[in-house]
């Protein structure tokens, strides 16, 4: 053994060939600050070996390196810029030393080589992968860009076009795709990976492979003539602006950095990369996007903890077909849980099966399933007009019309037919679970399971705990949601639960703004382009359905009359009274026609302005700041109330529910991250300017207390490790 640390080992293989093995404690290798330092120490030893002829780099795990340790990121980002710059120079010096070894080097890639793992293999002369390997640089998805030379070496290895695609999108590539673009030199069976890498290394040592020629382009300027460069980078910048937009600066910064570095060799190009990385790391967007990654890990860990030891059901049932029931049945069947789909109406069953077939057809067109697989998945959905076999289902999801009497009757009816351990869940969006539980003899076996539409796309499932819901019931439903590929978040019961409870104050703020003369076109534009929502409130109402929103609005007003009751007709009332229900009937705030692909195309409708004039002040232009404040303050206040009342258990779960359930702009990180970015005191001061508008704008006491004590919702990350001593700075 030449060198050994907690995360890697260096030893001789044979005849002057050394092997560097990444083998950290735990299930995966990460390129954390400690491992980077350990790599430097291993190179110290290696550089002194006069008999060294070659180096093979591999992993003892099922993946090479899954990336940097993202739990360290916020600490790094909170460091003074000069400290972060110093650490990046330190790290890049180590990767340069790996690249500059006076012998050929090769990486054997099994599983993932992402982020810093990808940058590490780029520093070797050759790369060989097993078929399941995936390689990529996902940093731009986290609001940053490669920082260990990825933006320098990848373009020089692959050419600018392929490198820009990988870096700007943050997507990883398969081993076979990596072979096609020149990212790896060979793909071999897993059992032959190390042997083949050793053979290739020996060929390089014997002069049969020119390892110096493989290394040379990575040290030199990018080989592009001025015309090619202008075309390549102009197209890339245009594409990035179109896809990422102004709220996600990292992809464009990466493209511009690669462009600026193209004419330089490695040293100057790395300096440019570091100089671009540091400001990105200090940005609010990076903190928010890294925060989302960490919150996602936390939420998934909570789900795993809740459902520990509980298997997903072998058979499920959905009561109520149609689009929603069909979507739930499809998702269940797709993820290998057979499902009974029951309805009282043959047409609804046909609609549900057609929905499942349509979604599977899309999978077929994309090559995700073949015809045989599609048929076998569809065969696991059993449509039925009666309850035959329902007693065999372990979890039953009620998804009938959003009417408390109908839901209660259906739940009571099915409960009489099933065993004492069968779990019942209601896919209600607003009706309190405790209200529905009154019709049941075994309320401990009952909870809410709120899917979002469209089911196959929306990652969130709200699991609603009623007053009598047992832990066993929650565990079973969380296990089912997880098996379905969803992110379950447990919330406590109240009208609207969490997501809809906080959505309707936002829509109420919109309604008041329109009442006071706001133009809904301008409001939508500001909330989409400036704040970053995928769709503005008027467009969202059309997509949700004006009739659905009108009904939910009444439920919320009854549940929270002190804030959500209103004594005036609003825009939703006007649309509803005029039977403008949104996309479902082709007219709402906007008019909808079908495009060539059969998707709804939004168009302006002058008739709407005339209808809204009945309930609005004369049109006036509000500032972007006013529009954002008047719509967002009610939502933010309600989100905070939900945490203070224990409806949600943590800021992390609240923020993930908003991002996954409502499409809250990820670059803000969720309401709690947004508040931490603004500063609680700044937010309270802003909200007070709108307090005259009513109770929805009154800041909750807990948030006022945080403002007074200068507290945040998320803990402040500790300082960056000092690069020379590995101790907190």
From Swiss-Prot:
Catalysed reaction, written as an equation: a (3S)-3-hydroxyacyl-CoA + NAD(+) = a 3-oxoacyl-CoA + NADH + H(+); a (3S)-3-hydroxyacyl-CoA = a (2E)-enoyl-CoA + H2O; a 4-saturated-(3S)-3-hydroxyacyl-CoA = a (3E)-enoyl-CoA + H2O; (3S)-3-hydroxybutanoyl-CoA = (3R)-3-hydroxybutanoyl-CoA
Site feature (Important for catalytic activity) residues: 119, 139
Positions contributing to substrate binding: 296, 500, 660
MF terms (GO), sorted A to Z: 3-hydroxybutyryl-CoA epimerase activity; delta(3)-delta(2)-enoyl-CoA isomerase activity; enoyl-CoA hydratase activity; long-chain-3-hydroxyacyl-CoA dehydrogenase activity; NAD+ binding
Classification via SUPFAM superfamilies: 6-phosphogluconate dehydrogenase C-terminal domain-like, ClpP/crotonase, NAD(P)-binding Rossmann-fold domains
EC number: 4.2.1.17, 5.1.2.3, 5.3.3.8, 1.1.1.35
Functional description taken from the UniProt entry: Involved in the aerobic and anaerobic degradation of long-chain fatty acids via beta-oxidation cycle. Catalyzes the formation of 3-oxoacyl-CoA from enoyl-CoA via L-3-hydroxyacyl-CoA. It can also use D-3-hydroxyacyl-CoA and cis-3-enoyl-CoA as substrate.
Name of the protein in its database record: Fatty acid oxidation complex subunit alpha
Signal peptide annotation: none
Taxonomic superkingdom: Bacteria
Annotated region (3-hydroxyacyl-CoA dehydrogenase), positions in chain: 311-729
Subunit structure of this chain's protein: Heterotetramer of two alpha chains (FadB) and two beta chains (FadA).
Active site feature: 450 (for 3-hydroxyacyl-coa dehydrogenase activity)
Pfam family, one: ECH_1
Pathway terms, separated by semicolons: Lipid metabolism; fatty acid beta-oxidation
Organism: Yersinia pestis
UniProtKB keywords: Fatty acid metabolism, Isomerase, Lipid degradation, Lipid metabolism, Lyase, Multifunctional enzyme, NAD, Oxidoreductase
Any one cellular-component term (Gene Ontology): fatty acid beta-oxidation multienzyme complex
Protein family membership: In the N-terminal section; belongs to the enoyl-CoA hydratase/isomerase family.
GO biological process, one term: fatty acid beta-oxidation
Span list, region Enoyl-CoA hydratase/isomerase: 1-189
InterPro entries: 3-OHacyl-CoA_DH_CS, 3-OHacyl-CoA_DH_NAD-bd, 3HC_DH_C, 6-PGluconate_DH-like_C_sf, ClpP/crotonase-like_dom_sf, Enoyl-CoA_hyd/isom_CS, Enoyl-CoA_hydra/iso, FA_oxidation_alpha_subunit
Binding site for NAD(+): 324, 343, 400-402, 407, 429, 453
């Amino acid at each position: 053994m030449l060198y050994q640390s907690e995360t890697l080992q260096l030893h001789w293989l044979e005849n002057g060939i050394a092997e560097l093995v990444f083998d950290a404690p735990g299930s995966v290798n990460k390129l954390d600050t400690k491992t980077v330092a350990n790599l430097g120490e291993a190179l110290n030893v290696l550089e002194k070996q006069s008999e060294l002829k070659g180096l093979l780099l591999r992993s003892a795990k099922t993946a090479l390196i899954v990336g940097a340790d993202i739990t360290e990121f916020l600490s790094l980002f909170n460091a003074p810029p000069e400290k972060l710059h110093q650490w990046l120079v330190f790290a890049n010096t180590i990767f340069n030393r790996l690249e500059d070894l006076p012998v050929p080097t090769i990486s054997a890639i099994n599983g993932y080589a992402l982020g810093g793992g990808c940058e590490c293999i780029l520093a070797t002369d050759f790369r060989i992968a097993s078929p399941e390997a995936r390689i990529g640089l996902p940093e731009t998805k986290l609001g940053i860009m490669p920082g260990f030379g990825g933006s320098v070496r990848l373009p020089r290895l692959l050419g600018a076009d392929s490198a820009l695609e990988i870096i700007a999108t943050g997507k990883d590539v398969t081993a076979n795709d990596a072979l096609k673009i020149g990212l790896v030199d060979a793909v071999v069976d897993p059992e032959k990976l190390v042997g083949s890498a050793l053979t290739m290394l020996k060929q390089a040592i014997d002069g049969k492979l020119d390892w110096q020629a493989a290394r040379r382009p990575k040290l030199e300027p990018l080989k592009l003539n001025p015309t090619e460069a202008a075309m390549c980078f102009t197209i890339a910048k245009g594409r990035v602006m179109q896809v990422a937009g102004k709220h996600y600066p990292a992809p464009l910064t990466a493209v511009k950095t690669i462009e600026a570095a193209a004419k330089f060799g490695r040293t100057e190009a790395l300096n440019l990369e570091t100089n671009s990385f540091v400001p990105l790391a200090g940005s609010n967007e990076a903190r928010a996007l890294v925060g989302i990654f960490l919150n996602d890990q936390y939420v998934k860990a909570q789900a795993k903890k809740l459902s520990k030891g509980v298997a997903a059901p072998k058979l499920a049932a959905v009561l109520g077909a149609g689009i929603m029931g069909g979507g739930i049945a499809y998702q269940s069947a797709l993820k290998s849980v057979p499902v009974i789909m029951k309805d009282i109406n043959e047409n609804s069953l046909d609609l549900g099966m057609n929905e499942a077939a349509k979604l599977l057809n899309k999978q077929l067109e994309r090559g995700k399933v073949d015809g045989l697989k599609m048929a076998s998945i569809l065969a696991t959905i059993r449509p039925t007009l009666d309850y035959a076999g329902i007693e065999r289902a372990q979890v039953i999801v009620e998804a009938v019309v959003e009417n408390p009497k109908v839901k209660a009757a259906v739940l009571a009816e099915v409960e009489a037919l099933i065993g004492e351990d069968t779990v019942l869940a209601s896919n209600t969006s607003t009706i309190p679970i405790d209200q529905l539980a009154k019709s049941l003899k075994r309320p401990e076996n009952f909870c809410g399971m709120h899917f979002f539409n469209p089911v196959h796309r929306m990652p969130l499932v709200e699991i609603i705990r009623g007053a009598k819901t047992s832990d066993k019931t929650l565990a079973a439903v969380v296990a089912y949601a997880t098996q379905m590929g969803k992110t379950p978040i447990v919330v406590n019961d109240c009208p609207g639960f969490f997501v809809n409870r906080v959505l309707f104050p936002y829509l109420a703020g919109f309604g008041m703004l329109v009442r006071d003369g706001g133009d809904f076109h301008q409001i939508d534009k500001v909330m989409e382009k400036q704040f970053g929502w995928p769709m503005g409130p008027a467009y969202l109402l059309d997509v949700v359905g004006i009739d659905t929103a009108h009904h939910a609005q009444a439920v919320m007003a009854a549940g929270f009359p002190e804030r959500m009751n209103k004594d005036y007709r609003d825009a939703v009332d006007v649309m509803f009274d005029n039977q403008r229900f949104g996309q479902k009937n082709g007219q709402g705030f906007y008019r909808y026609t079908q495009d060539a692909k059969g998707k709804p195309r939004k168009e302006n409708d002058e008739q709407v302005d005339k209808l809204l004039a009945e309930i609005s002040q004369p049109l006036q232009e509000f500032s972007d700041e006013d529009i954002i404040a008047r719509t967002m303050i009610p939502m933010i206040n309600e989100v905070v109330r939900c945490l203070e009342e224990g409806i949600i258990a943590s800021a992390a779960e609240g923020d993930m529910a908003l991002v996954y359930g409502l499409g809250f702009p990820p670059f803000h990180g969720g309401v709690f991250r947004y508040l931490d970015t603004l500063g609680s005191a700044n937010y309270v001061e802003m909200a007070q300017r709108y307090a005259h508008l009513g109770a929805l704008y009154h800041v909750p006491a807990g948030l006022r207390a945080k403002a007074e004590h200068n507290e945040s919702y998320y803990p402040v990350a500790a300082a960056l490790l000092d690069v020379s001593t590995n101790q907190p700075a």
